[in-house]
Structures are given as C-alpha cells and as structure tokens.
Amino acid sequence: MAMTTEVKDELSRLVVKSVSARRAEVTSLLRFAGGLHIVGGRVVVEAEVDLGNVARRLRKDIFELYGYNAVVHVLSASGIRKSTRYVLRVANDGEALARQTGLLDNRGRPVRGLPAQVVGGSIADAEAAWRGAFLAHGSLTEPGRSSALEVSCPGPEAALALVGAARRLGVSAKAREVRGADRVVVRDGEAIGALLTRMGAQDTRLIWEERRMRREVRATANRLANFDDANLRRSARAAVAAAARVERALEILGDTVPDHLASAGKLRVEHRQASLEELGRLADPPMTKDAVAGRIRRLLSMADRKAKIEGIPDTESAVTPDLLEDA
C-alpha cells in the first residue's frame, strides 16, 4: 500500500470525539475535495475522494452532525481515470449544508478560503482542518531526498488558510503555485512526522520514520563507501605520480645519485602501489616511513636542482594527465 493510501486509510478510521473538530474536518474535506454547484436553481454540495472509507466517513459525519443525507456515486476506473473515484453529493439540502459548514457566508456568497470558525478555532480544529484537506487531496511520498507531504488546494486563499493552520500546529508549510495549481508543501522530515501525528496518523508516521531512518543509514553507508573509494583513487594517483617523478630523477642524476637515495627511489619505482610504511619494511635494512619519505624527497629535490641548472625537463614533467588518468 502506498504511503498516501496508508495515511488516508488510518485517518478514515480515526475516532474523533470533539463535535467542533468533526465539523472542521467535514468543512475542510468539502472545501478541498469538491465545491458548490447550481443545479436547477439549487445549490448542490459535491466532494470527490479516492477511497471508499473516506466517502463513508464523510457521509456518516454529514448525517450525524447536520442531519442531511448524502448520496455516494462510484466512478470505476476507465480510460483516462486510472483509479476508482467516489463522488458524494448533497442535493436537496445542499444550500443549508453549505451555510452550516461555512462554505457560504451570511449573504449566500461562496467562501474562498476556509471559514472563520475553522481558521480561528481550537488546535483540535486546526488538526481537523489538515486531516480533512489531506483526506481530500493530500499525498505523502516515500522518505528520500525529495520526500514531501502535499495538499492540492482549490485556490490561493485555501492554501494560505492551510499554511496558517500548520503554523498554529508548530509546523512550517509553504504555499506554492505549480503549473497553475495551488499546493501546500511540507518538506522537512521532522515536520512531516509531526504533522502526521497531529492529523491522527501515528501508526503511519512510525512506518514512515522507520523507512526514513533506513534510507538515511543506507545513504550514510554509500557516502562512506564513496569517500573510501575516492581516497583510494587519490592514494593510487599519488603513488603513480611519485613513482614517475622518482624514475625521472634517477634518469637525471644517473651515476651521481647517492646509493642510499637510489635504493629508496628504486623501491618506489618497483613497488608503485605500496605505502611508505610498506616501502620501509621492504628496505634492507628496514626503515621508518618518515625515513623513506625523506630520502625520496631529497632525491627529487637534487634531481630538480640539476635539471634547472642544465635546462632540461624536471621530475614534474614525468607526471602527465594520461598517466594520472590510467592510475
């Protein structure tokens, strides 16, 4: 089951005792899932949702809170409709329901955002407003780099009302217009978790958090592996470059190179991938890695000085891009 469906399924089964919160949820769900239509001179309230559980919850709440019967029509998946949809309609008492839920104001005009009683209600009402909005048009992506909790909104006023409700819950949400559609987005992982709990999807939050932690552990392991690989590549390139410079130094100095420097240089050339510590153990007699490094440094310095005096390519000239690319 996708994360969005898991959240909606859990929210649709949530038991809410507060009448005010239940009313706020119904109002928000109707506002975000549908709208008001004039049919034959009458106001009809409609809401379209993607889960049967959500449609049944909304129908039950409308009847228990307002006493109106709603009819649910099932639109089966076909053609461009990828999944089954559920359309809830209140026709006979549409105007009365719209006024009581605050979707119409006292003058009978549609409210563009969320009604004042929801926006200025209690914290439980703010939670319910988010719950209704998510049940209507919410989505939750899997944890990851682009994880987000989003709600598609019917307009900018509704989006701003939802942002305000999130702020009251201590959650940072942003209103965005994407391809002409208004959305409210929460991207921070901690904020997503907090909002899931606030809405009432605690079980799904635990699943989401577990997946998030697993992904972070994998990402950390991958970063460390990449870091180790990069270090190995750098070390290999450095060893190849050092061996090439030593080879050139031995060419420049010829028979004039001191024996102790020559022996250290030959070790570097013969064992290109070995570390300085390993070269020290291979020396006869064995040396510390600092002693090996010191001798190679003096060998290169001596060769570069001679190359400068004679006007010939120095040891750095042996380190070509092709050489490092093959390392």
From Swiss-Prot:
KW Ribonucleoprotein (keyword) present: no
Domain of life, per lineage: Bacteria
Known DNA-binding region: 275-308
Gene3D superfamilies according to UniProt: Homing endonucleases
One Pfam family recorded for the sequence: WhiA_N
Keywords: Cell cycle, Cell division, DNA-binding
Biological-process GO terms, alphabetical: cell division; regulation of sporulation
HAMAP family named among the record's database cross-references: HTH_type_WhiA
Function as written in the Swiss-Prot or TrEMBL entry: Involved in cell division and chromosome segregation.
Family per similarity comment: Belongs to the WhiA family.
Protein name according to UniProt: Probable cell division protein WhiA
Organism, as annotated: Mycolicibacterium paratuberculosis (strain ATCC BAA-968 / K-10)
Gene: whiA
